[in-house]
């Protein structure tokens, strides 16, 4: 099973830059995990998509991760173990 995940980020966001290293590690370690990166601060379409995924503005910040399979999300800078568990990677 391939897990499709969205990673919403801001180009100038320092937390997003830190998390990029972890998402790259996750994709290398688990080839069945596909992360689609969407920059939102400079792209209106991506901003609309993050608002659709972050219903009720529950996170309201970046980075924001959305699992298209489970419909669950993850907000902010987290540890690798939490990212891995949330992603469904095995």
Predicted feature residues:
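Local sequence-structure signature of Cys/Sec-based thiol-disulfide redox active-site neighborhoods
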Residues: 1-35
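Non-catalytic, surface beta->alpha helical segment in thiol-disulfide oxidoreductase systems
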Residues: 61, 66-90
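Short Fe-S-cluster ligation motifs
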Residues: 43-60
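Solvent-exposed loop/turn segments at secondary-structure junctions
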Residues: 11-13, 42-43, 71-73
């Amino acid at each position: 099973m391939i897990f499709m995940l969205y990673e919403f980020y801001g180009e100038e966001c320092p937390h997003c830059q830190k998390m990029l290293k972890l998402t790259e590690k996750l994709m290398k370690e688990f080839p069945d995990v596909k992360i689609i990166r969407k920059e939102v601060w400079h792209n209106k379409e991506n901003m609309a998509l993050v608002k659709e995924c972050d219903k009720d503005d529950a996170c309201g910040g970046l980075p924001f991760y959305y699992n298209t399979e489970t419909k669950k999300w993850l907000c902010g800078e987290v540890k690798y173990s939490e990212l891995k568990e949330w992603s469904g990677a095995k």
